[in-house]
Swiss-Prot record:
GO molecular function, one term: thymidine phosphorylase activity
The protein's Enzyme Commission number: 2.4.2.4
InterPro entries (UniProt xref): Glycosyl_Trfase_fam3, Glycosyl_Trfase_fam3_N_dom, Glycosyl_Trfase_fam3_N_dom_sf, Nuc_phospho_transferase, PYNP-like_C_sf, PYNP_C, Pyrmidine_PPas_bac/euk, Pyrmidine_PPase_CS
Name of protein: Thymidine phosphorylase
A Pfam match: Glycos_trans_3N
SMART domains on file: PYNP_C
Entry function: The enzymes which catalyze the reversible phosphorolysis of pyrimidine nucleosides are involved in the degradation of these compounds and in their utilization as carbon and energy sources, or in the rescue of pyrimidine bases for nucleotide synthesis.
Gene Ontology BP term (one): thymidine metabolic process
Cellular component terms (Gene Ontology): cytosol
Subunit record text: Homodimer.
Organism domain of life: Bacteria
Pathway membership: Pyrimidine metabolism; dTMP biosynthesis via salvage pathway; dTMP from thymine: step 1/2
Lineage: Bacteria, Pseudomonadati, Pseudomonadota, Gammaproteobacteria, Vibrionales
Organism this protein belongs to: Aliivibrio fischeri (strain MJ11) (Vibrio fischeri)
NCBIfam families recorded: PRK05820.1 (NF004490), T_phosphoryl (TIGR02643), Y_phosphoryl (TIGR02644)
Amino acid sequence: MYLPQEIIRKKRDNKELTTEEINFFIQGVAKETVSEGQIAAFAMAVYFNEMTMPERIALTCAMRDSGMVIDWSHMNFDGPIVDKHSTGGVGDVTSLMLGPMVAACGGYVPMISGRGLGHTGGTLDKLESIAGYNITPSNDVFGKVTKEAGVAIIGQTGDLAPADKRVYATRDVTATVDNISLITASILSKKLAAGLDSLVMDVKVGSGAFMPTYEASEELAKSIVAVANGAGTKTTALLTDMNQVLASTAGNALEVREAIRFLTGEYRNPRLYEVTMALCAEMLVIANLAKDEQDARAKLQTVLDNGKAAECFGKMVFGLGGPSDIIENYDNHLESAQIIKPVFADTTGFVHAMDTRDLGMAVVGMGGGRRVASDTIDYAVGLSDMIRLGQTADNQQPLAMIHARNEEQWQQAANAVKAAIVISEKQPEATPEVYRKIRPEDV
Protein backbone atom coordinates (compact mmCIF):
# COMPACT_ATOMS: atom_id res chain seq x y z
CA MET A 1 0.00 0.00 0.00
CA TYR A 2 1.38 3.38 -1.05
CA LEU A 3 0.33 6.98 -0.43
CA PRO A 4 0.06 9.24 -3.52
CA GLN A 5 1.84 12.07 -1.68
CA GLU A 6 4.81 9.82 -0.87
CA ILE A 7 5.14 8.89 -4.55
CA ILE A 8 5.00 12.62 -5.43
CA ARG A 9 7.61 13.42 -2.75
CA LYS A 10 9.96 10.75 -4.09
CA LYS A 11 9.77 12.13 -7.64
CA ARG A 12 10.02 15.71 -6.33
CA ASP A 13 13.31 14.70 -4.66
CA ASN A 14 14.55 13.30 -7.99
CA LYS A 15 14.48 9.63 -6.96
CA GLU A 16 13.53 6.83 -9.35
CA LEU A 17 10.04 5.39 -8.89
CA THR A 18 9.43 1.64 -8.98
CA THR A 19 7.02 0.02 -11.44
CA GLU A 20 4.73 -0.81 -8.49
CA GLU A 21 4.63 2.82 -7.32
CA ILE A 22 3.83 4.06 -10.82
CA ASN A 23 1.12 1.40 -11.26
CA PHE A 24 -0.45 2.35 -7.92
CA PHE A 25 -0.48 6.07 -8.78
CA ILE A 26 -1.97 5.60 -12.28
CA GLN A 27 -4.62 3.15 -11.04
CA GLY A 28 -5.57 5.87 -8.53
CA VAL A 29 -5.82 8.38 -11.39
CA ALA A 30 -8.17 6.07 -13.31
CA LYS A 31 -10.28 5.28 -10.22
CA GLU A 32 -10.26 8.96 -9.18
CA THR A 33 -8.78 8.22 -5.74
CA VAL A 34 -5.86 10.48 -6.76
CA SER A 35 -6.94 14.14 -6.83
CA GLU A 36 -6.38 16.67 -9.61
CA GLY A 37 -3.97 18.54 -7.30
CA GLN A 38 -1.94 15.36 -6.84
CA ILE A 39 -1.84 14.75 -10.61
CA ALA A 40 -0.64 18.36 -11.09
CA ALA A 41 2.08 17.97 -8.44
CA PHE A 42 3.20 14.65 -9.94
CA ALA A 43 3.33 16.15 -13.46
CA MET A 44 5.38 19.13 -12.22
CA ALA A 45 7.80 16.82 -10.37
CA VAL A 46 8.29 14.82 -13.57
CA TYR A 47 8.58 18.05 -15.58
CA PHE A 48 11.55 19.23 -13.50
CA ASN A 49 13.24 15.89 -12.85
CA GLU A 50 12.33 13.84 -15.95
CA MET A 51 12.01 10.05 -15.85
CA THR A 52 14.44 7.24 -16.59
CA MET A 53 13.61 4.87 -19.47
CA PRO A 54 12.34 2.15 -17.06
CA GLU A 55 10.05 4.74 -15.42
CA ARG A 56 8.76 5.91 -18.82
CA ILE A 57 8.02 2.32 -19.86
CA ALA A 58 6.22 1.67 -16.55
CA LEU A 59 4.19 4.90 -16.89
CA THR A 60 3.22 4.09 -20.49
CA CYS A 61 2.18 0.52 -19.65
CA ALA A 62 0.23 1.65 -16.55
CA MET A 63 -1.66 4.25 -18.61
CA ARG A 64 -2.26 1.76 -21.44
CA ASP A 65 -3.62 -0.80 -18.94
CA SER A 66 -5.84 1.75 -17.13
CA GLY A 67 -8.65 0.89 -19.57
CA MET A 68 -9.50 -1.53 -22.33
CA VAL A 69 -6.65 -2.96 -24.42
CA ILE A 70 -8.09 -4.17 -27.73
CA ASP A 71 -7.44 -7.84 -28.46
CA TRP A 72 -7.82 -8.65 -32.16
CA SER A 73 -7.08 -12.40 -31.88
CA HIS A 74 -10.77 -13.38 -32.35
CA MET A 75 -10.82 -11.55 -35.72
CA ASN A 76 -8.33 -14.01 -37.29
CA PHE A 77 -6.67 -11.33 -39.41
CA ASP A 78 -4.39 -12.90 -42.02
CA GLY A 79 -1.80 -10.13 -41.69
CA PRO A 80 -0.04 -7.93 -39.14
CA ILE A 81 -1.76 -5.07 -37.27
CA VAL A 82 0.17 -1.88 -37.98
CA ASP A 83 -0.32 1.82 -37.38
CA LYS A 84 1.29 5.22 -37.73
CA HIS A 85 1.16 8.22 -35.42
CA SER A 86 2.15 11.77 -36.32
CA THR A 87 2.99 14.58 -33.91
CA GLY A 88 0.90 16.79 -36.19
CA GLY A 89 1.42 19.57 -38.65
CA VAL A 90 -0.29 21.61 -41.37
CA GLY A 91 -1.50 19.86 -44.52
CA ASP A 92 -0.40 16.59 -42.92
CA VAL A 93 -2.96 14.37 -44.64
CA THR A 94 -0.72 11.27 -44.85
CA SER A 95 -3.02 9.02 -42.74
CA LEU A 96 -5.79 9.16 -45.35
CA MET A 97 -3.53 7.67 -48.04
CA LEU A 98 -1.22 5.63 -45.83
CA GLY A 99 -3.96 3.54 -44.16
CA PRO A 100 -5.45 2.34 -47.46
CA MET A 101 -2.02 1.88 -49.11
CA VAL A 102 -0.72 -0.35 -46.29
CA ALA A 103 -4.07 -2.21 -46.21
CA ALA A 104 -3.81 -2.89 -49.94
CA CYS A 105 -0.36 -4.44 -49.29
CA GLY A 106 -1.70 -6.91 -46.71
CA GLY A 107 -1.53 -4.99 -43.41
CA TYR A 108 -4.45 -4.22 -41.10
CA VAL A 109 -4.63 -0.61 -39.92
CA PRO A 110 -7.09 0.04 -37.06
CA MET A 111 -6.19 3.70 -36.59
CA ILE A 112 -7.45 5.60 -33.56
CA SER A 113 -6.98 9.26 -34.41
CA GLY A 114 -7.39 12.66 -32.82
CA ARG A 115 -8.99 16.00 -33.52
CA GLY A 116 -7.13 19.14 -34.44
CA LEU A 117 -6.16 21.51 -31.66
CA GLY A 118 -4.08 24.64 -32.06
CA HIS A 119 -2.52 25.07 -35.51
CA THR A 120 -2.49 21.37 -36.45
CA GLY A 121 -5.26 19.70 -38.42
CA GLY A 122 -6.98 16.61 -37.01
CA THR A 123 -7.54 13.46 -39.06
CA LEU A 124 -11.00 13.02 -37.50
CA ASP A 125 -12.10 16.52 -38.51
CA LYS A 126 -10.99 15.81 -42.07
CA LEU A 127 -12.97 12.55 -42.22
CA GLU A 128 -16.04 14.15 -40.64
CA SER A 129 -16.17 16.52 -43.62
CA ILE A 130 -17.44 13.45 -45.54
CA ALA A 131 -21.23 13.33 -45.10
CA GLY A 132 -22.30 10.36 -42.96
CA TYR A 133 -18.82 9.22 -41.85
CA ASN A 134 -19.10 7.87 -38.28
CA ILE A 135 -15.99 8.30 -36.12
CA THR A 136 -17.53 6.52 -33.11
CA PRO A 137 -18.69 3.10 -34.36
CA SER A 138 -19.27 0.15 -32.04
CA ASN A 139 -16.28 -2.13 -31.44
CA ASP A 140 -17.97 -4.73 -33.67
CA VAL A 141 -18.26 -2.31 -36.59
CA PHE A 142 -14.67 -1.08 -36.01
CA GLY A 143 -13.44 -4.69 -36.24
CA LYS A 144 -15.64 -5.57 -39.22
CA VAL A 145 -14.52 -2.55 -41.28
CA THR A 146 -10.86 -3.16 -40.37
CA LYS A 147 -11.22 -6.76 -41.57
CA GLU A 148 -13.12 -5.98 -44.79
CA ALA A 149 -11.39 -2.75 -45.90
CA GLY A 150 -8.04 -3.44 -44.19
CA VAL A 151 -8.26 -0.01 -42.58
CA ALA A 152 -10.63 1.88 -40.28
CA ILE A 153 -9.89 5.36 -38.94
CA ILE A 154 -11.99 6.27 -35.89
CA GLY A 155 -11.90 8.46 -32.77
CA GLN A 156 -10.67 7.60 -29.29
CA THR A 157 -13.32 5.98 -27.12
CA GLY A 158 -13.54 6.65 -23.39
CA ASP A 159 -12.51 3.04 -22.64
CA LEU A 160 -8.99 3.48 -24.07
CA ALA A 161 -6.33 4.83 -21.69
CA PRO A 162 -8.76 6.75 -19.42
CA ALA A 163 -5.89 7.67 -17.05
CA ASP A 164 -4.27 9.59 -19.90
CA LYS A 165 -7.42 11.70 -20.35
CA ARG A 166 -7.24 12.90 -16.72
CA VAL A 167 -3.48 13.42 -16.73
CA TYR A 168 -3.60 15.30 -20.05
CA ALA A 169 -6.46 17.59 -18.93
CA THR A 170 -4.43 18.53 -15.84
CA ARG A 171 -1.17 19.03 -17.78
CA ASP A 172 -3.00 21.29 -20.19
CA VAL A 173 -3.85 23.81 -17.44
CA THR A 174 -0.65 23.51 -15.36
CA ALA A 175 2.08 24.26 -17.95
CA THR A 176 3.37 20.67 -17.98
CA VAL A 177 2.49 19.68 -21.56
CA ASP A 178 5.96 20.04 -23.06
CA ASN A 179 7.82 17.29 -21.25
CA ILE A 180 9.33 14.34 -23.14
CA SER A 181 8.46 11.66 -20.54
CA LEU A 182 4.83 12.77 -20.26
CA ILE A 183 4.40 13.27 -24.02
CA THR A 184 5.85 9.80 -24.69
CA ALA A 185 3.49 8.09 -22.24
CA SER A 186 0.47 10.07 -23.47
CA ILE A 187 1.01 9.23 -27.15
CA LEU A 188 1.94 5.60 -26.62
CA SER A 189 -0.64 4.66 -23.98
CA LYS A 190 -3.42 5.43 -26.48
CA LYS A 191 -1.68 3.86 -29.47
CA LEU A 192 -0.59 0.66 -27.69
CA ALA A 193 -4.11 0.16 -26.27
CA ALA A 194 -5.17 -0.48 -29.88
CA GLY A 195 -3.47 -3.89 -29.80
CA LEU A 196 -0.80 -3.22 -32.45
CA ASP A 197 1.96 -5.53 -33.68
CA SER A 198 4.05 -2.59 -34.86
CA LEU A 199 4.01 1.20 -35.03
CA VAL A 200 5.76 3.88 -37.09
CA MET A 201 6.06 7.36 -35.57
CA ASP A 202 6.18 10.47 -37.75
CA VAL A 203 7.88 13.16 -35.65
CA LYS A 204 7.73 16.56 -37.33
CA VAL A 205 10.60 19.05 -37.45
CA GLY A 206 10.44 22.77 -38.26
CA SER A 207 8.24 25.87 -38.04
CA GLY A 208 4.97 23.94 -38.01
CA ALA A 209 6.12 21.18 -35.66
CA PHE A 210 4.94 20.45 -32.14
CA MET A 211 8.52 20.40 -30.78
CA PRO A 212 10.38 23.72 -31.10
CA THR A 213 13.79 22.48 -32.36
CA TYR A 214 15.31 19.64 -34.36
CA GLU A 215 17.09 18.42 -31.21
CA ALA A 216 13.83 18.29 -29.22
CA SER A 217 12.06 16.43 -32.05
CA GLU A 218 14.92 13.93 -32.22
CA GLU A 219 14.87 13.44 -28.44
CA LEU A 220 11.10 12.77 -28.52
CA ALA A 221 11.49 10.30 -31.41
CA LYS A 222 14.23 8.39 -29.56
CA SER A 223 12.14 8.31 -26.37
CA ILE A 224 9.10 6.94 -28.22
CA VAL A 225 11.13 4.25 -30.01
CA ALA A 226 12.86 3.14 -26.79
CA VAL A 227 9.66 3.12 -24.70
CA ALA A 228 7.38 1.46 -27.27
CA ASN A 229 9.88 -1.33 -27.91
CA GLY A 230 10.39 -1.65 -24.15
CA ALA A 231 6.62 -2.04 -23.79
CA GLY A 232 6.65 -4.85 -26.35
CA THR A 233 5.53 -3.11 -29.57
CA LYS A 234 8.00 -3.01 -32.48
CA THR A 235 8.38 0.68 -33.31
CA THR A 236 10.52 2.96 -35.47
CA ALA A 237 10.35 6.72 -36.05
CA LEU A 238 10.95 9.04 -38.98
CA LEU A 239 11.87 12.70 -38.53
CA THR A 240 10.04 14.56 -41.32
CA ASP A 241 9.97 18.18 -42.43
CA MET A 242 7.28 20.68 -41.37
CA ASN A 243 9.01 23.91 -42.45
CA GLN A 244 6.27 24.27 -45.06
CA VAL A 245 2.73 23.01 -45.53
CA LEU A 246 3.15 19.32 -46.40
CA ALA A 247 0.29 18.90 -48.89
CA SER A 248 -0.92 21.44 -51.46
CA THR A 249 -3.93 22.09 -49.22
CA ALA A 250 -4.72 22.91 -45.59
CA GLY A 251 -8.32 22.60 -44.45
CA ASN A 252 -10.66 19.69 -43.90
CA ALA A 253 -12.69 18.98 -47.06
CA LEU A 254 -9.82 20.35 -49.18
CA GLU A 255 -7.39 17.80 -47.71
CA VAL A 256 -9.86 14.93 -48.24
CA ARG A 257 -10.12 15.95 -51.91
CA GLU A 258 -6.33 15.97 -52.15
CA ALA A 259 -6.09 12.52 -50.50
CA ILE A 260 -8.58 11.02 -52.98
CA ARG A 261 -6.83 12.65 -55.95
CA PHE A 262 -3.54 11.26 -54.61
CA LEU A 263 -4.94 7.72 -54.34
CA THR A 264 -6.43 7.80 -57.85
CA GLY A 265 -3.31 9.36 -59.38
CA GLU A 266 -5.12 12.54 -60.46
CA TYR A 267 -2.52 14.66 -58.60
CA ARG A 268 0.30 13.85 -56.19
CA ASN A 269 2.19 16.65 -54.48
CA PRO A 270 5.86 15.53 -54.61
CA ARG A 271 6.70 16.26 -50.95
CA LEU A 272 3.51 14.62 -49.71
CA TYR A 273 4.27 11.64 -51.95
CA GLU A 274 7.80 11.24 -50.55
CA VAL A 275 6.76 11.47 -46.87
CA THR A 276 3.78 9.13 -47.38
CA MET A 277 5.90 6.57 -49.27
CA ALA A 278 8.68 6.70 -46.65
CA LEU A 279 6.22 6.09 -43.79
CA CYS A 280 4.31 3.35 -45.63
CA ALA A 281 7.54 1.60 -46.66
CA GLU A 282 8.77 1.61 -43.05
CA MET A 283 5.43 0.15 -41.93
CA LEU A 284 5.69 -2.68 -44.47
CA VAL A 285 9.31 -3.44 -43.54
CA ILE A 286 8.82 -3.59 -39.77
CA ALA A 287 5.64 -5.64 -40.20
CA ASN A 288 7.53 -8.13 -42.43
CA LEU A 289 5.28 -7.36 -45.40
CA ALA A 290 8.33 -6.36 -47.49
CA LYS A 291 12.00 -7.42 -47.58
CA ASP A 292 13.44 -3.92 -47.58
CA GLU A 293 12.56 -0.35 -48.47
CA GLN A 294 12.99 -0.87 -52.22
CA ASP A 295 10.68 -3.90 -52.20
CA ALA A 296 8.15 -1.98 -50.07
CA ARG A 297 8.10 1.04 -52.39
CA ALA A 298 7.54 -1.20 -55.42
CA LYS A 299 4.57 -2.90 -53.71
CA LEU A 300 3.12 0.48 -52.68
CA GLN A 301 3.47 1.92 -56.18
CA THR A 302 1.65 -1.16 -57.55
CA VAL A 303 -1.39 -0.68 -55.27
CA LEU A 304 -1.53 3.01 -56.18
CA ASP A 305 -1.31 2.23 -59.90
CA ASN A 306 -3.84 -0.64 -59.94
CA GLY A 307 -6.43 1.24 -57.87
CA LYS A 308 -6.37 -1.18 -54.94
CA ALA A 309 -5.40 1.51 -52.40
CA ALA A 310 -8.21 3.81 -53.59
CA GLU A 311 -10.63 0.87 -53.33
CA CYS A 312 -9.61 0.28 -49.68
CA PHE A 313 -10.32 3.96 -48.90
CA GLY A 314 -13.75 3.72 -50.57
CA LYS A 315 -14.61 0.55 -48.62
CA MET A 316 -13.59 2.18 -45.33
CA VAL A 317 -15.72 5.29 -45.96
CA PHE A 318 -18.76 3.23 -46.98
CA GLY A 319 -18.28 0.78 -44.09
CA LEU A 320 -18.29 3.66 -41.60
CA GLY A 321 -21.49 5.24 -42.91
CA GLY A 322 -20.22 7.46 -45.72
CA PRO A 323 -21.25 7.43 -49.40
CA SER A 324 -20.48 4.43 -51.62
CA ASP A 325 -19.11 6.60 -54.47
CA ILE A 326 -16.70 8.88 -52.59
CA ILE A 327 -13.80 7.98 -54.93
CA GLU A 328 -15.73 8.57 -58.17
CA ASN A 329 -17.84 11.56 -57.10
CA TYR A 330 -16.03 13.18 -54.19
CA ASP A 331 -17.19 16.69 -55.08
CA ASN A 332 -20.83 15.66 -54.50
CA HIS A 333 -20.05 14.74 -50.88
CA LEU A 334 -17.62 17.47 -49.76
CA GLU A 335 -18.53 21.09 -49.04
CA SER A 336 -17.07 23.96 -51.08
CA ALA A 337 -16.48 27.53 -49.93
CA GLN A 338 -18.43 30.46 -51.41
CA ILE A 339 -15.33 32.54 -52.16
CA ILE A 340 -12.26 31.00 -53.79
CA LYS A 341 -9.65 33.58 -54.83
CA PRO A 342 -5.84 33.71 -55.07
CA VAL A 343 -3.62 35.77 -52.76
CA PHE A 344 -0.44 37.26 -54.26
CA ALA A 345 2.75 38.43 -52.57
CA ASP A 346 3.40 42.19 -52.42
CA THR A 347 6.90 41.70 -53.89
CA THR A 348 8.47 39.37 -56.44
CA GLY A 349 11.10 36.86 -55.35
CA PHE A 350 11.79 33.39 -54.04
CA VAL A 351 9.75 31.87 -51.22
CA HIS A 352 12.53 31.83 -48.63
CA ALA A 353 10.72 30.67 -45.48
CA MET A 354 7.25 29.93 -44.12
CA ASP A 355 5.84 30.18 -40.64
CA THR A 356 3.86 26.97 -41.03
CA ARG A 357 2.26 27.39 -37.60
CA ASP A 358 0.86 30.80 -38.64
CA LEU A 359 -0.50 29.32 -41.88
CA GLY A 360 -2.27 26.68 -39.79
CA MET A 361 -3.66 29.42 -37.56
CA ALA A 362 -4.92 31.28 -40.66
CA VAL A 363 -7.08 28.21 -41.43
CA VAL A 364 -8.24 28.09 -37.78
CA GLY A 365 -9.09 31.81 -38.00
CA MET A 366 -11.47 31.07 -40.89
CA GLY A 367 -13.23 28.41 -38.81
CA GLY A 368 -11.32 25.43 -40.23
CA GLY A 369 -9.97 24.40 -36.81
CA ARG A 370 -10.59 24.83 -33.11
CA ARG A 371 -9.30 27.40 -30.64
CA VAL A 372 -11.09 25.56 -27.82
CA ALA A 373 -12.32 21.97 -27.87
CA SER A 374 -16.00 23.00 -28.04
CA ASP A 375 -15.66 25.05 -31.28
CA THR A 376 -17.55 23.82 -34.34
CA ILE A 377 -15.67 23.40 -37.61
CA ASP A 378 -16.36 24.88 -41.03
CA TYR A 379 -15.25 22.01 -43.28
CA ALA A 380 -15.16 24.01 -46.53
CA VAL A 381 -12.64 26.73 -45.68
CA GLY A 382 -8.87 26.58 -46.03
CA LEU A 383 -5.95 27.01 -48.41
CA SER A 384 -5.18 25.20 -51.66
CA ASP A 385 -2.53 25.43 -54.39
CA MET A 386 0.04 26.31 -51.72
CA ILE A 387 3.31 27.69 -53.03
CA ARG A 388 6.42 25.75 -51.93
CA LEU A 389 9.79 26.87 -50.57
CA GLY A 390 12.15 27.87 -53.38
CA GLN A 391 9.38 28.67 -55.87
CA THR A 392 9.07 32.16 -57.36
CA ALA A 393 6.19 34.33 -56.19
CA ASP A 394 5.10 37.04 -58.65
CA ASN A 395 1.93 38.50 -60.12
CA GLN A 396 1.33 35.25 -62.04
CA GLN A 397 2.11 32.74 -59.25
CA PRO A 398 -0.10 33.19 -56.17
CA LEU A 399 0.99 32.22 -52.66
CA ALA A 400 -2.22 30.19 -52.31
CA MET A 401 -5.88 30.00 -53.21
CA ILE A 402 -7.98 31.02 -50.20
CA HIS A 403 -11.32 29.26 -49.71
CA ALA A 404 -13.46 31.51 -47.48
CA ARG A 405 -17.09 32.00 -46.40
CA ASN A 406 -17.13 35.74 -47.13
CA GLU A 407 -14.99 38.67 -48.31
CA GLU A 408 -14.02 39.82 -44.82
CA GLN A 409 -12.80 36.33 -43.91
CA TRP A 410 -10.89 36.12 -47.21
CA GLN A 411 -9.15 39.45 -46.49
CA GLN A 412 -8.11 38.42 -42.96
CA ALA A 413 -6.74 35.12 -44.28
CA ALA A 414 -4.93 36.90 -47.14
CA ASN A 415 -3.17 39.20 -44.67
CA ALA A 416 -2.21 36.22 -42.49
CA VAL A 417 -0.84 34.22 -45.44
CA LYS A 418 1.25 37.17 -46.69
CA ALA A 419 2.64 37.76 -43.19
CA ALA A 420 3.56 34.07 -42.79
CA ILE A 421 5.59 33.76 -46.01
CA VAL A 422 9.03 35.38 -46.40
CA ILE A 423 9.92 36.47 -49.96
CA SER A 424 13.62 37.03 -50.68
CA GLU A 425 16.00 37.65 -53.58
CA LYS A 426 18.02 34.60 -52.66
CA GLN A 427 16.82 31.05 -52.98
CA PRO A 428 16.66 29.04 -49.73
CA GLU A 429 18.63 25.86 -49.16
CA ALA A 430 16.51 22.81 -49.96
CA THR A 431 15.25 20.90 -46.91
CA PRO A 432 14.88 17.12 -47.10
CA GLU A 433 11.43 15.56 -46.73
CA VAL A 434 12.83 12.95 -44.32
CA TYR A 435 15.76 13.89 -42.06
CA ARG A 436 16.47 10.52 -40.50
CA LYS A 437 15.06 7.19 -39.41
CA ILE A 438 15.34 6.02 -35.80
CA ARG A 439 15.22 2.27 -35.29
CA PRO A 440 15.37 0.33 -31.98
CA GLU A 441 19.10 -0.28 -32.42
CA ASP A 442 19.67 3.52 -32.59
CA VAL A 443 18.44 4.10 -29.03
